[in-house]
């Protein structure tokens, strides 16, 4: 533990860029001004937490969030392509209607919101790699 006490925390771009500049300037101008291509500025990139609060409480780890996204995608696929669920006593009458219910719409909205967050992380990863 003595080795950890001697380390200093690396400065992040969040520490370097003033809040007023973050609000007023475009991403391109911030990139040109604060991100160095020659390594002169030694600052780490930071990631803002864009996860909705309700998902953060239920799924505190990234692994749990990705597992949730996978499960909801599979469930949505099952509900979309499997057809209606038949009642065990009456095979002629479907248990679920063909129209989307409120639960399905809520599930789709939550899945799309979480997928948008993951897509932003992946887009940022592609920007940082390029």
Curated annotation (Swiss-Prot):
List, alphabetically, the InterPro entries matched.
Herpes_TT2
Gene Ontology biological process terms from the UniProt entry: viral DNA genome packaging
Q: Name one GO cellular component term.
A: host cell nucleus
Q: Record's Pfam families?
A: Herpes_UL33
What keywords are assigned to this protein? Answer: Host nucleus, Viral genome packaging, Viral release from host cell
Its subcellular locations are: Host nucleus
* Primary localization class, coarse: host cell
Q: Which family, according to the similarity comment?
A: Belongs to the herpesviridae TRM2 protein family.
Known function:
Component of the molecular motor that translocates viral genomic DNA in empty capsid during DNA packaging. Forms a tripartite terminase complex together with TRM1 and TRM3 in the host cytoplasm. Once the complex reaches the host nucleus, it interacts with the capsid portal vertex. This portal forms a ring in which genomic DNA is translocated into the capsid.
Q: How does it assemble?
A: Associates with TRM1 and TRM3 to form the tripartite terminase complex.
Protein name, as recorded: Tripartite terminase subunit 2
Q: What gene is this protein a product of?
A: TRM2
């Amino acid at each position: 533990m003595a080795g950890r006490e001697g380390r200093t925390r690396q400065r992040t771009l969040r520490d370097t860029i003033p809040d007023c500049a973050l609000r007023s300037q475009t991403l391109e101008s911030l990139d040109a001004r604060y991100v160095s291509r020659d390594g002169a500025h030694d600052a780490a990139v930071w990631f803002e937490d864009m996860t909705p609060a309700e998902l953060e409480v239920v799924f505190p780890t990234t692994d749990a969030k990705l597992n949730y996204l996978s499960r909801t995608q599979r469930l949505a696929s099952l509900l979309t392509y499997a057809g209606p669920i038949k009642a065990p006593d009456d095979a002629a009458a479907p248990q679920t209607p063909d129209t989307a219910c409120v639960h399905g719409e809520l599930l789709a909205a939550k899945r799309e919101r979480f997928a948008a967050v993951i897509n932003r992380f992946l887009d940022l990863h592609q920007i940082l790699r390029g």
